[in-house]
A protein has these predicted regions:
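Active-site-proximal loop/hinge segments that shape catalytic or ion-binding/gating pockets
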Residues: 409
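Acidic, Mg2+-coordinating active-site environments of NTP-dependent enzymes
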Residues: 109-110, 134-141, 157-244, 258, ...
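Short, flexible loop segments at boundaries between secondary-structure elements
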Residues: 359-361, 427-436
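N-terminal leader/targeting and accessory segments in enzymes
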Residues: 1-48, 52-67, 76-78, 193-201, ...
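ATP-dependent carboxylate-amine ligase catalytic core
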Residues: 22, 26-37, 63-155, 171-173
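Nucleotide phosphate-binding/pyrophosphate-handling subdomain across enzymes
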Residues: 38, 137-140, 148-161, 165-169, ...
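Beta-strand->loop->alpha-helix junctions that form or flank phosphate-binding loops
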Residues: 71, 196-199, 211-232, 248-252, ...
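C-terminal helical cap/extension that packs against the catalytic core
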Residues: 198-220, 232-234, 301-302, 310, ...
Length: 436
């Protein structure tokens, strides 16, 4: 089986949609001899911030000398970004081997009407690959929610982490914060340990405290006292617990995510993991997360952000107001199932001009519809039919010293990255996961 055939097999499962529940994934794993039981995990849920928390935690553990698996989503340019060991993507031939092994098992379920979803398939694949490669520990990002997410087929992790909780995927997870928090709390196992991002909406911390008490789990809340010492487009230096740390990430929310990750690492230390202070400093400084306020170019300034809900939009607005005072041109594309009106209300007034585009995804909002909404908040908005057209229009609209901001969807970020690379000078070094 070739890599292309493997990807086609995986993508073919997208037609089976989303079917929350753990029965199918547990059956798949049982037929693979339960690879997840041979692994240790840090399990991370949350609406916003879980990607940063995963990236920081995995980076530190790698600096500490461990073989670290990372399972995350979404990808930006290459599907294989979702499966990494020590910062390197699964090789094409190994992805093909895993798909070839798993396909007959999944197809047997399909044949009796118990179809295996794409996420269940790739989660089982990830566990099997990480176990085969003998990872010391895996940083595991929840796909959606937590309670019925396929990643929750694991036993109690070394640490569970819940990042910031806000309204998203309300049709599936519920239309109130307490309903969504309950779903996220599904990753808390009896007798386990939960590190909870403490800057939650009112009532969420107490709700999670009660759930932990019911399950005999320990709740660990990070110290909310920290001090930002320096911040720029190059990153942030902050102090927490007498320790000075630097991350390449922008915004106060990212400092809070880093404080949460730092607390999770302390829980691992208590569990016997050897994590020197130097590994924490180096790991935080070297962590990378594509398309999260990523500086793609410095002259002209180009920022790439895949955030897709109002919470992400608010964080991006804050960063733009603080770090990007110059005239801004935007390229925006969103999914139809997201609250684009609220995101545009927050962001669009900052732009002199916006070009809208529909990302290459069946759920994408048409560019014309997005342009109509954006036009309520920005004086000049034009739809484009292709990424190439959007980039060309944006570059034409920019004057000397202007900034280009690409935002609204990870699907858009991945599509447009190569288009921008061919047209921007002073590109930052490409830090996407390396190929094995």
């Amino acid at each position: 089986m070739t890599n292309e055939e493997a990807l086609a097999k995986i993508n073919g499962r997208l037609t089976f949609g989303m079917k929350p529940g753990l029965r199918r994934i547990k059956q798949l794993l049982e037929e693979l001899d339960n690879p997840q039981k041979k692994l240790k995990f840090v399990h991370v849920a949350g609406t916003n911030g879980k990607g940063t928390t995963c990236a920081l935690t995995a980076s530190v553990l790698r600096q500490a000398g461990y073989t670290v698996g990372l399972y995350t989503s979404p990808y930006v340019e290459d599907f294989r970004e979702r499966f990494q060991i020590n910062g390197e993507m699964i090789p094409p031939e190994e992805l093909a081997q895993e798909v070839e092994l798993l396909s007959p098992i999944a197809e047997a379920h399909d044949a009796v009407g118990d179809t295996v979803t794409e996420f269940e398939f790739i989660t089982a694949l990830a566990f099997h690959w990480f176990a085969r490669r003998q990872c010391d520990i895996v940083v595991l990002e929840v796909g959606l929610g937590g309670r019925f997410d396929a990643t929750n087929a694991i036993d109690a992790p070394e640490a569970a982490v819940i990042a910031s909780i806000s309204l998203d995927h309300t049709a599936i997870l519920g239309d109130t914060l307490d309903k969504i928090a309950f779903e996220k709390a599904g990753i808390v196992k009896p007798g386990g340990r939960l590190v909870l991002y403490p800057w939650q909406a009112e009532g969420i911390v107490e709700q999670l405290r009660g759930i932990c008490e019911e399950r005999g789990a320990e709740l660990i809340l990070p110290d909310t006292r920290y001090q930002v010492l320096e911040e720029s487009l190059e990153g942030t230096v902050f102090q927490t617990g007498g320790e000075t740390l630097r991350t390449p990430f922008l915004g106060e929310h990212q400092v809070r995510n880093a404080v949460t990750a730092r607390t999770a690492l302390e829980v691992l230390r208590r569990r016997g993991w050897r994590i020197p202070d130097g590994a924490i400093r180096e790991g935080f400084a070297k962590a990378f997360l594509p398309a999260r306020m990523e500086v793609l170019s410095t002259a002209p300034l180009c920022l790439l952000d895949g955030g897709h809900n109002p919470g992400c939009a608010a964080a991006l607005r804050d960063a733009l107001e603080r770090f990007v005072p110059q005239r801004k041109v935007g390229i925006m594309g969103v999914m139809a199932d997201k609250d684009s009106h609220e995101a545009l209300r927050l962001l669009a007034p900052l732009f002199a001009e916006i070009i809208t585009i529909a990302p290459d995804n069946p759920r994408a909002l048409p560019a014309e519809e997005l342009a109509r909404t954006a036009g309520e908040f920005c004086p000049r908005v034009r739809p484009a039919q292709t990424c190439g057209e959007a980039v060309a229009r944006a570059m034409k609209a920019m004057g000397p010293g202007d900034a280009l901001i690409v935002c609204g969807s990870f699907y858009l970020a991945g599509e447009i990255r190569d288009q921008l690379k061919g047209k921007l000078a002073n590109l930052q070094p490409d830090r996407l996961p390396q190929k094995m």
